[in-house]
Structure formats: C-alpha cells, structure tokens
C-alpha cells in the first residue's frame, strides 16, 4: 500500500478512516485551526506522543500530553476523572480537540472523556494496535469499565477522523497482532469471507506488518464496520452483529479481571458462538469447525477453563444485548449470514460450552495473555 486509502463512514456526521503510512501530516492537517489539543497516550507511546505534540506546536497549536495507564487499567472512572481535571487546567473548550494515541482501551477512554467534556468535544483516533484499527477506533463507541461489567458506562461519540498508520504495527509485539486478529476473523465470518480465505491461504502473511496481506485485511475489516455503523450507529439492531463472539468473550475478560487480552477472549467466544449456532440447528458443521481451524492458524486460543461455566453464565447476564433478563446471542445461519438467538435453553449453553471447555489451565494459543 503506497498511497493512503480513505474509507468514508457515512453516518449523520461523516468522517474518514485513512489507512496508510507516515500519517503525521494528515493529523496536523485535521487539526489546523484548533487552538488547544490534548493527546491521550499510553506509556510505551510517550516518544511518539511527544513527536505529535512537537509537530502540532510548530503549527501554533497548544498541545498537551496526557499519559494514561496501559490496557484496561486505563478504562477506569478515576482515570477519566484525572483526565477531566487536566482538560480543565489546560482550558480545553468545545472548539478544541482530543487525540487518542494507542490501543483499543486508549480510544475507548479518550472517546468517553471527549464525549462527556462540555457535553462533547472533537476527538481524532490514531490507533496503534491491530485491534484498535479494525474495531475500537471506528464506530463511535466509547466507555469505561466498572465492577458490574465491561463498557457498561459509556456513550456514542463519533470521531472526526481515524488515522491508521500501518507503520506502527511494525513496532508492536507479535502477540498484539495475534490478539487483534480475532476481530478480523470475526468480520470474515459475519460479512466478508474473502478475509477468511486470505488468512487460510497464508497465515504468516496475514500476521506480517511489512507485507501486503495484513493491510488488505485491515481495509476489508474497516469497510465492513463502516457499512454496519452507517446503517445503525447506536446499536439498535444491525450493529449487534459486530458483537459476534463477544457475549462469552466479555464474560471471560471480566472473570480474568482483564488479564486476558480482548482478542484472546473473543476468540474463545467465537468458537462457543459457532457451536451454539450448530447445536441450535442453524449453522452447518463445516462452517462451525472452520472457526476453530482459522483461529488456531493465527495462534489464538480456542479453549477455556471447564470449571468456569457457572461464573461465565453469571457474567453474560450483564451483556448489553440482553433484554428483560433474557440472554441474546449473535449466531450464524451460514457463512456471512448473522442472526440472533434469544433465550436459549440452559442445556444448549452447557453443550456449547463443552466445545471450548478444557480441564486445568486454559490454553494461551501463543502468548496472548497479558
């Protein structure tokens, strides 16, 4: 990919997702005319954040760095409160902007703070992990975690732009790319089978940030999400399909107190959801089995603790898709044919969980735990 690719998200407030390399100039252009900018970044990205701050300062923009805790530790009310205090000190107004620089947790937190500061200020996301590029940064979902569950406090607040700089993937550990691949695989199953074919053809190429396959996977994933979000921004109907595999996945994350990467938990959730669809008579055997095969090809886990089922069912009760206390799952009626399964019999859940249950310590699928 030599020239940047632009994917337009056609919501009521359209915005571009720009995919390319060396996009600092694009960020500066997006912020031209802004007086004050707050750059939210995670600790490993301090040097990059300083480069962004300096580039903005050269254009006369008063830019400030706000370092936030890494991963899910940053999605906390106390951290959000600290960020609000900083925004107050630097005098950030409605005509100013927030920039997120980091993984999915950084985009979630920065988006939430931007949504709530003065009832909404502009935010631009610069995702630096695969998961954030293909999922968290696009679509306007923001949120923080509480003891009650993951992302239960949040808002819909669309970014004014998303800048996906592919060069950043060359600096992250391989297990970050592996973890993000869960969302890519999910997208393939719900909407774009070409994604699955590309991974099956050459799994190593799919994980190579210097090659041509991974950028295509990112582009395809972003295009799918852009179409879904444009049709259903606030997750009233269609957008729920993006949560395929997430019902069990979020419950695993909560049980592990977020020590598992999001992608690892979603991978197990995808195998569970596929089995649920199979047992409900809605998904064919070949497509159900293909889930485990592809996820294992890229090094993701497909099993979890056999003794955890009771706790996971309890955790799934807080899922945002539920209605009137009834569990609701996204399942497949075939490849790229997502649907819903409401109130499945408990015996069906038990049988589906047997497909991922593993005695003793769950497999990590290649160091995808934090």
Curated annotation (Swiss-Prot):
KW Oxidoreductase (keyword) present: no
> Which Gene Ontology terms of cellular component type are present?
cytoplasm
Q: What is its main location?
A: cytoplasm
- Cofactor remark from the record: Binds 1 divalent metal cation per subunit. Can use either Co(2+) or Zn(2+).
Q: What class of enzyme is it?
A: lyase
Where in the cell is the protein located? Cytoplasm
Q: Return the InterPro entries for the record.
A: Dehydroquinate_synthase, DHQ_synth_AroB, DHQ_synth_fam, DHQS/DOIS_N, DHQS_C
Record CDD domains = DHQS
What keywords are assigned to this protein? Amino-acid biosynthesis, Aromatic amino acid biosynthesis, Cobalt, Cytoplasm, Lyase, Metal-binding, NAD, Nucleotide-binding, Zinc
Domain of life (superkingdom): Bacteria
Q: Name one GO biological process term.
A: amino acid biosynthetic process
E.C. numbers: 4.2.3.4
* Gene Ontology terms, MF aspect: 3-dehydroquinate synthase activity; metal ion binding; nucleotide binding
* Sequence positions that bind Zn(2+): 183, 246, 262
Which pathway does it serve?
A: Metabolic intermediate biosynthesis; chorismate biosynthesis; chorismate from D-erythrose 4-phosphate and phosphoenolpyruvate: step 2/7
Per its record, the protein catalyses: 7-phospho-2-dehydro-3-deoxy-D-arabino-heptonate = 3-dehydroquinate + phosphate
Requisite cofactors: Co(2+); Zn(2+); NAD(+)
Q: Which NCBIfam families match?
A: aroB (TIGR01357)
**Biological role stated in the UniProt entry:** Catalyzes the conversion of 3-deoxy-D-arabino-heptulosonate 7-phosphate (DAHP) to dehydroquinate (DHQ).
What the record says about family reads:
Belongs to the sugar phosphate cyclases superfamily. Dehydroquinate synthase family.
Q: What is this protein called?
A: 3-dehydroquinate synthase
The organism is Rhodococcus opacus (strain B4)
- Identify the coding gene: aroB
